Design a protein with these regions (language model features):
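Active-site-adjacent beta->alpha loops and helix N-cap segments on the catalytic face
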Residues: 18-38, 56-60, 76-100, 105-116, ...
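Alpha/beta catalytic cores of nucleotide-metabolism and tRNA/nucleoside-modifying enzymes
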Residues: 50, 117, 139-163, 168-169
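The conserved cystathionine-beta-synthase
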Residues: 1-6, 13-14, 29-32, 56-65
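Active-site beta->alpha loop and helix N-cap motifs at the rims of alpha/beta catalytic domains
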Residues: 46-58, 62-72
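Short beta-strand/loop segments at the ligand-binding rim of alpha/beta enzyme cores
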Residues: 40-50, 91-106, 121, 154-165
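Catalytic beta/alpha-barrel core
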Residues: 9-11, 50-52, 70-81, 99-104, ...
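Terminal peptide-recognition signature
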Residues: 2, 10-12, 17, 28, ...
Length: 169
């Protein structure tokens, strides 16, 4: 109807005729093309920001959370360490409403370790991607499908799992 009648915006009003929003043709198109986009309760795309495991990680994540990110990703080449879990616990202690995703890992033991520490999501992948140098530099890596299967079986869908690299569609 919008396109046929060359109407750019469709007002959304309450019973009292108070304007509460506008719908555009591109809004409808986005809904049709990307029905499972990760959005917040207001319909906005959720935003995550990655931090490393450094001396200023807590300060950086605090600034990111104050700016409105929905999730923090603790991004490290080897997520199965006490230092990573220490940072995870520190962030969870002060930011209960913010999802904390942690990775990368490649084993069921590491997944359980992060899950027990409070991770809201887990990134899987040690050396699987085409631009990743971990296998060359460190001499270690796990085939991506094997790592994902191992991790998913061990945590039984308790948190989302992200496959980070090594998969072609």
């Amino acid at each position: 109807i919008l396109q046929q009648n060359k109407i750019e915006k469709l007002p959304v009003v309450t019973n009292e005729n108070k304007l509460v929003g506008l719908i555009t043709f591109s809004d409808i198109t986005k809904l049709k093309l990307k029905p499972i986009a990760n959005k917040d309760k207001y319909g906005r795309l959720r935003v995550a920001a990655a931090i490393g495991v450094t001396d200023d990680s807590v300060e950086r994540s605090t600034a990111l959370i104050k700016s409105g990110v929905d999730a923090i990703v603790i991004d490290t080449a080897h997520g199965h360490t006490e230092r990573v879990v220490g940072l995870l616990k520190e962030l969870k202690k002060n930011n209960e409403d913010v999802d904390i995703v942690v990775g990368n890992i490649a084993t069921s033991e590491a997944a359980k370790f992060l899950l027990e520490a409070g991770a809201d999501g887990i990134k899987v992948g040690i050396g699987p991607g085409s631009i990743c140098t971990t296998r060359i530099v460190a001499g270690v890596g796990v085939p991506q499908f094997s790592a994902i299967l191992d991790v998913c079986k061990s945590i039984n869908n308790k948190v989302p799992v992200i496959a980070d690299g090594g998969i072609k569609y």
